[in-house]
Structure formats: C-alpha cells, structure tokens
Amino acid sequence: MKKLQQILNAKGAQLTEDGIIGSRTLTALDWYITNRINNNKWLRPKDGLVFLRTDTVFSNTFDDYCAVYKGGVCVAVVPCSTTAGDKYVFSPITHMGITGTAVAAEQQVIGSHHFVTNKKWSTLWLGAPYFQQIHAITIWRDGTRDRTMDRVNKQFGLFGINIHRGGVAAIVGSWSAGCMVIPDNHWFPITNNFVNGQIIDFTLLEI
C-alpha cells in the first residue's frame, strides 16, 4: 500500500509511506475521492465501492485500488484490478462487431450493480458473492493485443462488467475479461458489508 500513500502524497497529503493503512491514510483517501467526485459533480458514496485506476497498462496484476464505504465513511481500501487479465487482453472477444477486451471508462453510474449472495455459496457464480451489473455503463474495447490501454472504440451497454473475487494468485489471469476483481483474501471480508439484493453505484476514477 506504499504506492497508494505515494499517490496521495503527490496529491497533497502528508502521509508516512510505510504501507500501513490506518485512519490517516483512509482520511486522506476519502479527501481525495471527495474532491474528485465534487469536481465531476458526481454523488459521494454512502454504502458502496469506489475504484481507483492507477495507470493505463494491462499489467495482469492487482495494481489498482478499491475504497470501501459504509455509512458515508471510508472504512477500508484494498488492492484490485480494473482491467482484464492476460487471457482476455491477448485473446479478446468480439462484441457488436468490435474485437477487443472490455475496459471500463472513468465514470459514475447510479444503481449500476446489485449484490448477489445466499447461504450456499457453491450455487453462486464463481462460488462466491458478487456484484452483478444491472445498468448500462461505458467501456472502451481494446483489440490491439498489447499492454497499452487504447481509448478508440467506445461502447455503452450491459456487458457483464461485474465486481467479484479475483482468486488467490498474484496475477489476474483469467479472472477478469473487464470486470473489477479483488483478491480473495480481501474480497471475502468486503462482502460482509453488504446484503443480498443491495444496490450500489459504479464509480471509477483514473488517478
């Protein structure tokens, strides 16, 4: 988490870059998110997730961040990936006549996802609770099959850009074709903050 602290310090925070996520780091993160949301004239989250994309590279790693909000308070931040893993970057699908892996654009969509869970996780998609896309969002479809994100082909719709577990490895691999994915050891604690059917917004900031 040192990288996040370095990013926040570059934006004006004064954090010790020790990789420890305490109240000062969460406060600084909330300050940054709130400023960006206000500048964009978006809605500040009450209960939900805010994704922070740190670069425009398909790194196949969890090098982005997800801030968790509960009751309007930023209660946690965890690593995530907001871009597809190598499987889909180098073997992209074709959708609506355009070949390319899906890359969610910076945006906020109100009520975009709902939480899906039950007592028997084995019956759930990917064997775990997840957030399912239920409203259209904007994506780029990148078909250049390299590690650089291109913003050429834009689409708007329901593409199954869900939010879910990202496995136990250090790489994204086949876990994401454009979904927001969070490593299992961070994902499962996050799910305790939500109930089945709960609706959240999709908020993605590029920093």
Please identify what each model-predicted range represents.
Residues 182:
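Short, well-ordered, aromatic-rich surface patches in folded extracellular/luminal domains
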Residues 1-32:
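Short acidic, glycine/serine/threonine-rich helix-capping segments at coil-helix boundaries
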Residues 176:
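Active-site neighborhood of thiol-dependent amide/isopeptide-bond enzymes
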Residues 21-173, 187-200, 205-207:
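Cell wall/extracellular polymer interaction/catalysis modules
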